[in-house]
Amino acid sequence: MTAASTSKWGLVTNVVNSIVGVSVLTMPFCFKQCGIVLGALLLVFCSWMTHQSCMFLVKSASLSKRRTYAGLAFHAYGKAGKMLVETSMIGLMLGSCITFYVVIGDLGSNFFAPLLGLQVTRTFRVFLLFAVSLCIVLPLSLQRNMMASIQSFSAMALLFYTVFMFVIVLSSFKHGLFSGQWLQRVSYIRWEGVFRCVPIFGMSFACQSQVLPTYDSLDEPSVKTMSSIFASSLNVVTAFYVMVGFFGYVSFTDATTGNVLIHFPSNLVTEMIRVGFVMSVAVGFPMMILPCRQALNTLLFEQQQKDGTFAAGGYMPPLRFKVLTLSVVFGTMVGGVMIPNVETILGFTGATMGSLICFICPALIYKKAHKNAPSAQVVLWVGLGILVVSTLTTLSVSEEAPLDLTQGARSGQRGDAEGAMKVEAARLSVQDPVVVMAEDSQEKLKPAEDKEVLEQAQIKGPVDVPGGDTPKEKQEAAQLDRPGQGIAVPMGEAHRHEPPIPHDKVVVDEGQDQEGPEEKKPPPKLPDEGDPAGRGQGAPLLPESEKKQDPERGEEGKRPEQVLAVGEIERPQKIPEANGQPPVQPRKEDSRPGNRDLHPVPQARVSVELNDLVAGEGKESAQKAGGAPWKPMESAVESNIGGKAGLAVQRPEAAEQREKNEAEQPGGDQAGSKLEEAGRAEMLDHAVLLQVIKEQQVQQKRLLDQQEKLLAVIEEQHKEIRQQRQEGEEDKPKPADMQPEPGAAVLRGQEEEAEHAGAPDEHAGETLEDNPSQPLQPVLGAPRGHPAPSQDKGQHPLEEVKVLAGRDLADLPAGGSDTEPHGASSKLREDQKGAALKVAEAVRKLVPGDLEPVHKPDPAEVPKSPEKQLAKEVARQRQDVFGEGSQERKETGKDAVAPGADTQKEAAQPLVGAEAEDSHSKSRHSEPTKVPASGPAGMGFQAQARFRQEPQVIFDKSQDSHPEVRSEGPRGVGIPAEEQHRGRGAAAMQEEKQRPDPNSGPKLAVPGDQKPENAKPNRDLKVQAGSDLRRRRRDLASPPEQELAPKDGVIISFNSLPNVQVNDLRSALDTQLRQAAGAALQVVHSRQIKQLSGDLEEA
């Protein structure tokens, strides 16, 4: 039972969604036409008839086994019956679509026009309908399968209808529901409106097209279940309609029009409901277009099958599908544009197609199967009566409607001001129970006129204005009679002496009183607040409220209204000037945001000039508008809101004199000169920008030249490295160290080397620890010069990379920042692997005996002099490039370079050349491999590398050792001092093994320093040391030499050496990136320079 009840209420909800539509908006109007009692009875009667017709269809379907409306008609009456049903269905759907468009035009235009600052005109309404049909309705209608989303939208629309009902109820409370005054206003029974309202009621319940699909969707189709489902749905809808009709009619009584939403004052809730209606209606179009399109397809194109039946829901070719959809969408849009109001289209459609579909056809089909059916007879005759009488009644009333309803009501539909006035009239009528509604509105308006006259006399009395009070009264009457006061369309003299007068005068003063243009702009809003004026509010109060509200509006938006209010031909000429000059000021401000620091004075001057220009424009406008004595008086009225008559008298004269003086002065010339000055200021700004750009270009050229020099140096180093490889193969012993596991080898190498390492190694470790902040910067600054300690750590990655080429790939994710260097270096490795292997064999033989004894003395002694030289060269080069480089930076760079550099210099100078390229590629691999060796320190470095990934990439391209330095520097931060000393000790041990190249250590230190142009020899040393290390690593592949692996693990740190080559590749890329990046790179380079100089000083 639970599942069954759940499914039942789900079907009830779907049926209610299909029944409730925009016709709910016309319920108060129908109650007004028929009276409260008769309207409620008619609703109940139409609900009963709808239920009966639905049961006719269900019973006929159960007997004939047909599941479509057209199929039942064909079964009963042949092809004629099928065509009747299909044409009626098409007409009903088209009428519904037209109704949707009318509602969108009424509600949407009243909502969107004020937002856009436009008037609610017929042209805007047409434009809105076209935009909605093109942007919302058409895309949804062109979808073949939209039912799921449409149902969700329909459920959302039902929520809007519910909220709408509550708003109606609350409005009735607000309009005196419990005071009982409405009892004398409303009518209870009016037989005249029966035939006009019954078709609307009938169409409001139209759900016959949903009957058979719902019946077919039941798990166990039965007539009893269908009867309960539709009875529940119709009861809910009937209660909903009665509530909306009753409370809506009580709220607005005789002022009620076809679309009740138009009466509501503009506030957040009502605007939300209006927008909700518009969107629900727009989204509900496919619900109407889908069956309409299908019916058109079957009616026009479907062929009868051999068995005499028609295929239901056949496939529709794409072209036909699109043509039918377009014709329906835009055809109904034309109908929505042509038909004036909702009640007319609903009444006509309901009287014709609605009566056929809802009552006549179901009754005829049922009578064919069941001869004796009294209920079918009743429904049939009522339907025929509606078809004939209601059609005539609706057409006749629609012709008279423009005189009765649409003269005031249609204009009310086009403007919120009219609706608000009607609401106020209803509200006032509630307060006076004796007066009839029609008289009430007039009587309430006339006192408002009297108050208005008195108010204005109070302010303007002392001034002798030509025109006197008599024209004022006439003008006020004219304006109050006009429905669209909310629209700023003054009608000649009618506006001049009304509250809008300050509006016109303000336009004149706007130019004269240069100080407060915003205060004078309020007048355009006066017409918008014409309703309060009509209601008897004081005119002087309007300018203040407007002044508060006007600043929010843009000047441009207000001035056009002012032009309209003045109604003069010269006025439009002022507008382009006033609107054209403000853009000048914004442009200057826009061009300045980046250059405000450069030219603050020109900006201020320009703004002053612009203000003068605006003032000049105001004067010109005043001159053009000047000449009428009442205009100065208007300005006086606005300025003297307090009602000071004496001031009002004096000010008109001053204004007239001002206008005369201004007429004599050529304001256009002043404006032109000011524009020229503003243009000059802009030219200055542009010139400054050009200079800055030129300077940046010059700097970029310098960088490019330096990078080219670096590339040339690197090429020379490569050549020397190759030669040194050959020599190193013959001279250097082969290291007996093997690293079965790169991570373990690195750890062991660091430990052993830490033991063997001398003071220089310790010093190197200290330099890193002393400057914990440096590792972060070296990541960026590495391109120019990297401390040697990072290189020592880089040596470990070199060995690891060589030992495990495949593992490098696995480790790469750990050092994600190095993936790019790895790709660049892989090419170099392939070229140099052969030579490196040979060198490695020679290294194996030479290393074992030389490792320990050689290690300590060399790093301390040999590297210092070359390191200092390198540091100086680097500093000079960087100063040349960037114009920066302090002695402190050089010293720090030297300190960092010294320890690792010495060990690396001793390690292998000749080998550096051969292995530089390999280490180049491996260093990038080695950084990922370092991650396991260094542990969390490596992790921190990776995070840092990622954090500065862009700068690293840019500078790594220009400087080969940089990637190693990046990984090593941050690791140095994370790694304890002991590990750093160990790493350096390992480097020293390796250098001892590589003793044949005692100068390789300084060269290793140089790699960062060699990146400058002057560091060629240092790069050679780096390359040699790297080549030696690589050879040893390759030699270490043999198991007997694994024992020495921990020491050689330090060799991995030589990866920094290979970075020299990487820098070559990156330098080329660097040039391009720098060109794109511009000044941003310069900042990064400056940081690098600082770091390098600091490292040199420490060394």
UniProtKB/Swiss-Prot annotation:
The keyword Secreted does not apply. The gene is Slc38a10. Facilitates bidirectional transport of amino acids. May act as a glutamate sensor that regulates glutamate-glutamine cycle and mTOR signaling in the brain. The transport mechanism remains to be elucidated. It comes from Rattus norvegicus (Rat). It is a multi-pass membrane protein. The modification Phosphothreonine is found at residue 767. One of its GO terms (molecular function) is L-amino acid transmembrane transporter activity. The modification Phosphoserine is found at residues 441, 607, 635, 886. It catalyses: L-glutamate(out) = L-glutamate(in); L-glutamine(out) = L-glutamine(in); L-alanine(in) = L-alanine(out); L-serine(in) = L-serine(out). Only expressed in the pituitary, adrenal gland, stomach and in the upper gastrointestinal tract. The keyword Ribonucleoprotein does not apply. It is found in: Membrane. It comes from the Eukaryota. Belongs to the amino acid/polyamine transporter 2 family. Residues 440-679, 720-1047 are annotated as: Disordered. One of its GO terms (cellular component) is membrane. Residues 441-454, 493-508, 517-528, 544-561, 586-599, 653-663, 720-735, 749-766, 793-802, 852-894, 917-928, 957-969, 1010-1022 have a biased composition (Basic and acidic residues). InterPro entries: AA_transpt_TM. The chain crosses the membrane at residues 9-31, 36-58, 84-104, 123-143, 153-173, 229-249, 272-292, 323-343, 345-365, 378-398. GO terms for biological process: amino acid transmembrane transport; bone development; inorganic cation transmembrane transport. Keywords: Amino-acid transport, Coiled coil, Membrane, Phosphoprotein, Transmembrane, Transmembrane helix, Transport. This is Solute carrier family 38 member 10. Residues 698-734 form a coiled coil.
